[in-house]
From Swiss-Prot:
NCBIfam families: PRK11594.1 (NF008615)
Cell compartments where the protein resides: Cell membrane
Upper classification of the organism: Bacteria, Pseudomonadati, Pseudomonadota, Gammaproteobacteria, Enterobacterales
Gene Ontology cellular component annotations, sorted alphabetically: plasma membrane
Descriptive protein name: Protein AaeX
Organism: Pectobacterium carotovorum subsp. carotovorum (strain PC1)
Transmembrane segments: 10-30, 43-63
Membrane topology per record: Multi-pass membrane protein
Keyword Transmembrane helix set for record: yes
Keyword Transit peptide: no
Family to which the UniProt record says this protein belongs: Belongs to the AaeX family.
Swiss-Prot/TrEMBL keywords: Cell membrane, Membrane, Transmembrane, Transmembrane helix
Length: 67
């Protein structure tokens, strides 16, 4: 049995990981907007791969330690 309950919103049931996903997506966009002006993407070999890895790391950190 999972320790996290299923969330019901307007008659639709969502798994708990869905809300962690939404929070991590929001945090990803904030971090991405902060990294854009720094010019870090000039040093990144593959920006899409970097963004995917950044999102995966944020999702893991929020799921494991945050929410």
């Amino acid at each position: 049995m999972s320790s996290l309950p299923v969330m019901v919103l307007f008659g639709l049931s969502f798994p708990p990981v869905f809300f962690v996903l939404l929070v991590s997506l929001t945090l990803f966009f904030v971090v991405n907007c902060l990294l854009q002006p720094t010019g870090i993407y000039d040093f990144v070999w593959h920006p899409a791969l970097f963004n995917s890895a950044l999102f995966c790391c944020l999702f893991y950190l929020l799921f494991r330690y945050g929410l």
